[in-house]
Amino acid sequence: MADLQDEVHTTTDVDGAAGPFGDEACRADRADLADLAEAFVPVSDPDTEPLERAHAILATHPVADGYSGLPWALRHLPWFDLETGEAAVDTDVPRLREGHVGALFWSLHLPKGLDGDRAVGATLEQLDLVRTVVRTHPEGLRLACTAGQATDARRCGRIAVLLGPAGAAAIGESLGVLRSLFALGLRVLTLSGVSWASEAGLTRFGEEVLREMNRLGVLADLSGASGETVRRALVVSKSPVLCTRSAAHALRPHPANLPDDLLAELGAAKGLCMVPLTAKQTGPTVHDVADHLDHVRALAGPESVGLSGTYDVGTAHPRELADASCYPRLIAELLGRGWTEADITLLTWGNVQRVLRSADFTARAAQQRREPSTAKIAELDG
């Protein structure tokens, strides 16, 4: 029987931060927020027009975009050049710069129906494609795996590319494959659509996957996961979790949107809800998107809301937010609604930085007390 490591994690309270390194991780989160508050210096003139203020704020605190479907979109193009501009997609370097995007999570999700070895192989191909795209666009893009690397990329005038989320099927029911994908740069994994993370919630193997993700520094993405999976993940995970493309279910009942109770629980656990700019999930106008951001901020808190362009996934976007260049319009709308500059900087950059730093801290602490898990799904789930 493979050893089931850190079984004690399953009894941790969401907001109690109990456990062998939960207290330290929570202290690190609080320190991150304190550092951000202490270091914050306004960069815009409150007497100027909102759009002008938006550009000024974003020039210093760019957007960390939680979800881009660009890798899959590029697979179907015979040729592309993202540095000079690519009309066939919603995202290229000129538009990212115009929209003040400083970091971008590139989705490795696959079409439905791929599982087992086929899913693992297709994910490896996606990783290879992303690395090739970044390597061939050195003036605009740079791979990043940590908060520090993302900041370094921005300081060098590059847009940080973070790998993930990948679908849960990508690991092929193997923690060894999970570790291999991490070694190749994967930093976010979606916990849904597999037997160990289903409508019924996380199985024993699913919980062990999440613990191993914590040990490595792979963030859990809970967008599209069942309510039972979300709740259990908030209990088991020692790192903050992400919802890379979830808005408010109370405003728009899309299956990937979160109900109010889960938004509150996510905020209590210092997770991050990244609101997508898609008409299906948030509505047809920039005002609708701002309504969702207001709602999420009110329930989860300003430290638990982020942005997710969700461009290049084949879906319609709200008016005035058609592509990656349009973020200043959204920020101007929020400023017009009374959002403070401090809250805007958390929304665009600070919250993602906090989550990445916390995941790294948790991983380093976990690696001091546990070896790589040898658990097998057949042994834990039968």
Identify the residue ranges that each predicted region occupies.
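N-terminal hydrophobic targeting/anchoring segments and the immediately downstream early-domain regions
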Residues: 2-208, 253-382
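Short, glycine/acidic-enriched loop or turn micro-motifs at the edges of active sites
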Residues: 68-70, 224-227, 248, 313
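Glycine-enriched alpha-helix->loop->beta-strand junction motifs that scaffold or abut catalytic
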Residues: 100-101, 186-188, 212-218, 236-242, ...
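Loop-centered beta-sheet repeat module
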Residues: 199-234, 240-244
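Glycoside hydrolase catalytic-domain context in secreted enzymes
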Residues: 216, 223-226, 246, 276-277, ...
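Aromatic-anchored, glycine/proline-accented short structural segments
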Residues: 225-269
